[in-house]
C-alpha cells in the first residue's frame, strides 16, 4: 500500500473519498505574518486576518492563535493583549480556535530564566543540583501555563494546544502533564491537544514519573495513555525525520510508529506533520509531492484521527495537507467533526457518524461541498462565503451548540456578558 502511494504518478495525491480527517495547527498565524528566516512568508497582517484566512481561504477545520515568541513564558507579560485578540477572533470566527504555545522549559534556565542551567551543573558533576533545577523549572512551567490558560479560557478560547511537549526532556513533559491535569480539573469542557516534540522522551532528569510511569525513554505508543490519563482530548504523536535518509524510508518508519500509537491511544490521535516530523522532509518550503503522500499514508495506513499541521510555508503545509486529506472546514463539515473529537473524545469514525446523524445525511456527505453548503445555510451554522444576514461568529456557534448538543466556550462567555 505504501509503495503504491509513493509511486503514484501525480505530483499531488489525496485520500480516498470518505476518509478525510480534521486538521489542527501548530505555530498559529506565524506562517503568514512571521519572517524569522524559517517558514514564515512575512505578509504584514493582523492575527485576526491570519486566523480568518485559514478558516475561509485555506479551508481549515480548526485554527489557533499564538504569540510571535510562541512559548507560554513570554506570553505572561502580554497576556491581556492575547486575551483581547482571542475575544475579537472568537467574535468573528466559527471553527474551533485554540490558544497554542510551547511549554519550552528551556526558557526557565539561565540566562533566560531563574534556575541554573542543568547542562552546566551536570558538566560540573553537580547531579543533585541539576535534578533540583529541572524539578523547580517544571513546577514553574505548570504554574505559568495554567495561569495563562485561565486568562485565555475566560476570554473565549475553545482550548489549548501544547506544541512540542517534552522539548527540554522528561522535566518538560512532567510539567506539561501536570498542567493538563490541573486545567482539566478546573475546566471540564476545555479542548486540550498535547503534541510531542520528538518520538522519544529524552531522560534529562531520568527519575521523573507520572502516574507511576517513568517518563524518560517513552515512545509514542507509551506516551499516548499517559497524555489521556492527564486529561487531554487529543494526542499528537511524533516520529522524527532522519535527514540522511530518503522520504520513502522516513515515511515507512513514521507510519509504523504512528500506527502503533493510534492503536494504543484511548483518545484521538492527530499526528504531527510539520517539517522534520511525520515523514515530512526538513525544508522550510516542504515539497508538495512528499507532503501529500505522507498525509495520505498517515490516514489510510496509520489510521490517524487527524493531522496537526506544523512548520512550513502556507502552500507546503496547510494547503497541501488540507487538499490531500482535510475535511475543508466550513466548506463542508470539518469544524463540526473536529468539535466532536475534542468535546467528547470521539475517534474519527464515531465523530463522523454522530455529526452525520445530527445533520440527517450520509457520512460521505460531510465532505460534499454542495450538500453541506445548502445545509449550513439552511441551519444557519456558518458558511464560508459572506452572505448578508447569515449567522456569523457567535450566532453561528450558538446554532452549532443546539445542533450537536454541546457547549462552546465563546458562546458561554457571550451569554455571561449579556446576562
Curated annotation (Swiss-Prot):
Q: Which reaction is this enzyme known to catalyze? A: Co(I)-[dimethylamine-specific corrinoid protein] + dimethylamine + H(+) = methyl-Co(III)-[dimethylamine-specific corrinoid protein] + methylamine
UniProt keyword annotations, A-Z: Methanogenesis, Methyltransferase, Pyrrolysine, Transferase
InterPro entries with a match to the protein in the record: Dimeth_MeTrfase_MtbB
**Keyword Methyltransferase tagged:** yes
- Give the record's GO biological process terms: methane biosynthetic process from dimethylamine; methylation
Pathway assigned in UniProt: One-carbon metabolism; methanogenesis from dimethylamine
Q: What is its EC number?
A: 2.1.1.249
**What family does the entry list?**
Belongs to the dimethylamine methyltransferase family.
Quote the function comment for this protein. Catalyzes the transfer of a methyl group from dimethylamine to the corrinoid cofactor of MtbC. No evidence for expression of this protein has been found after growth under presumably inducing conditions.
Entry protein name: Dimethylamine methyltransferase MtbB2
Amino acid at each position: 500500500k505504501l509503495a503504491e502511494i509513493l509511486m503514484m504518478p501525480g505530483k499531488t495525491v489525496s485520500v480516498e473519498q470518505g476518509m478525510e480527517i480534521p486538521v489542527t495547527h501548530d505555530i498559529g498565524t506565524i506562517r503568514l505574518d512571521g519572517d524569522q528566516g524559517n517558514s514564515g512568508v512575512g505578509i504584514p497582517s493582523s492575527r485576526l486576518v491570519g486566523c480568518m484566512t485559514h478558516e475561509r481561504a485555506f479551508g481549515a477545520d480548526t485554527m489557533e492563535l499564538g504569540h510571535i515568541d510562541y512559548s507560554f513564558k513570554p506570553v505572561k507579560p502580554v497576556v491581556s493583549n492575547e486575551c483581547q485578540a482571542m475575544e475579537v477572533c472568537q467574535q468573528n470566527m466559527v471553527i474551533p480556535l485554540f490558544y497554542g504555545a510551547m511549554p519550552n522549559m528551556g526558557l526557565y534556565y539561565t540566562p533566560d530564566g531563574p534556575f541554573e542551567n542543568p547542562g552546566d551543573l551536570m558538566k560540573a558533576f553537580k547531579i543533585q543540583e541539576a535534578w533540583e533545577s529541572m524539578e523547580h523549572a517544571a513546577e514553574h512551567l505548570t504554574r505559568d501555563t495554567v495561569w495563562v490558560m485561565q486568562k485565555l479560557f475566560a476570554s473565549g478560547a475553545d482550548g489549548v494546544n501544547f506544541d512540542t511537549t517534552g522539548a527540554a526532556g522528561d522535566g518538560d513533559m512532567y510539567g506539561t502533564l501536570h498542567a493538563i491535569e490541573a486545567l482539566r480539573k478546573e475546566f471540564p469542557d476545555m479542548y486540550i491537544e498535547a503534541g510531542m516534540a520528538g518520538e522519544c522522551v529524552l531522560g534529562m532528569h531520568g527519575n521523573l514519573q507520572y502516574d507511576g510511569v517513568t517518563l524518560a525513554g517513552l515512545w509514542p505508543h507509551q506516551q499516548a495513555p499517559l497524555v489521556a490519563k492527564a486529561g487531554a482530548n487529543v494526542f499528537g504523536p511524533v516520529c522524527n525525520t532522519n535527514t540522511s535518509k530518503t522520504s520513502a524510508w522516513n515515511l515507512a518508519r513514521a507510519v509504523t510508529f504512528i500506527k502503533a500509537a493510534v492503536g494504543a491511544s484511548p483518545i484521538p490521535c492527530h499526528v504531527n506533520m510539520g517539517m522534520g516530523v511525520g515523514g515530512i522532509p526538513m525544508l522550510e518550503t516542504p515539497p508538495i509531492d512528499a507532503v501529500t503522500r505522507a498525509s495520505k499514508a498517515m490516514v489510510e495506513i496509520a489510521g490517524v484521527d487527524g493531522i496537526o499541521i506544523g512548520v512550513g510555508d502556507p502552500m507546503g503545509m496547510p494547503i497541501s495537507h488540507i487538499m490531500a486529506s482535510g475535511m475543508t472546514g466550513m466548506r463542508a463539515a470539518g469544524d463540526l467533526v473536529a468539535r466532536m473529537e475534542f468535546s467528547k473524545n470521539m475517534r474519527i469514525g464515531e465523530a463522523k457518524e454522530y455529526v452525520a446523524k445530527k445533520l440527517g445525511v450520509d457520512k460521505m456527505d460531510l465532505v460534499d461541498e454542495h450538500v453541506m453548503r445548502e445545509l449550513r445555510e439552511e441551519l444557519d451554522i456558518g458558511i464560508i462565503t459572506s452572505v448578508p444576514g447569515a449567522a456569523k461568529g457567535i450566532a453561528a456557534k450558538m446554532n452549532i451548540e443546539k445542533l450537536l448538543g454541546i457547549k462552546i466556550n465563546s458562546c458561554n462567555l457571550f451569554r455571561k456578558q449579556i446576562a
